[in-house]
UniProtKB/Swiss-Prot annotation:
It comes from the Eukaryota. Component of the SET1/COMPASS complex. Component of the PNUTS-PP1 phosphatase complex. This is WD repeat-containing protein 82. GO terms for molecular function: chromatin binding. The lineage of its organism: Eukaryota, Metazoa, Chordata, Craniata, Vertebrata. The keyword Transcription applies. GO terms for cellular component: chromosome; PTW/PP1 phosphatase complex; Set1C/COMPASS complex. The gene is WDR82. It comes from Gallus gallus (Chicken). PROSITE patterns: WD_REPEATS_1 (PS00678), WD_REPEATS_2 (PS50082), WD_REPEATS_REGION (PS50294). CDD domains: WD40.
Amino acid sequence: MKLTDNVLRSFRVAKVFRENSDKINCFDFSPNGETVISSSDDDSIVLYDCQEGKPKRTLYSKKYGVDLIRYTHAANTVVYSSNKIDDTIRYLSLHDNKYIRYFPGHTKRVVALSMSPVDDTFISGSLDKTIRLWDLRSPNCQGLMHLQGKPVCSFDPEGLIFAAGVNSEMVKLYDLRSFDKGPFATFKMQYDRTCEWTGLKFSNDGKLILISTNGGFIRLIDAFKGAVLHTFGGYNNSKAVTLEASFTPDSQFIMIGSEDGKIHVWNGESGMKVAVLDGKHTGPITCLQFNPKFMTFASACSNMAFWLPTIDD
């Protein structure tokens, strides 16, 4: 089944899970699309089975809190950042609920975490104005970059380069093998005082970069030239909430939630809004991602919703 405007318009909430007492701050699908794992401000980690459509188990990180949870490539392991007492990144085995390794180094809250799509490398960005490069096999930081402001960062789909959004006005592209030489490309954007950048993602085809903000718009830029292709708005975000924006796996559509529980979808090529879907969420949709392998997506406030199409084109 191919994603089209009509298929997207047909998506409806198939299941809602109320496992959390506070907002879900992040979730991540496993690369095979079979499970999704969430982190929440209530200090819990919930693992869901996407095929059976049910929660499988819940773990807790009471002492440190849990945010920015990401699957690694090894089965049943995740990395996540703390949102409480320290800024160490933790590598957890879900299998026996034991920490495999800690990654200390950041001195302020970690605000970005991206796992390499191809190996055990990952990068983190922090309010201490640094981006750190790590390898899951070693607790020691493999590389460090000092920046002029708050960074957001992400790997490209090949795992060869990463992009850093700095100070909500610049995108810098780095070659992973020689990032200490500085960026090989820098794209300066029009600075907007009204909001901050909250995230950065590559499309699966590597041609586009999506910049999320805590304002009322998101930007789509050309990953090679840095030109702004589209600015998408018209959704509610009056309280400067961090709303996650995502590509569909075919790189054709862009989705974002809003503070009123609706999901807005645009065609990345034409820039036209193709759908507004009502998730009936009780709070702002802070997390939204399409499943990498199956025709389903998930959205979250303090509840988790799984969506399915109601037509089969």
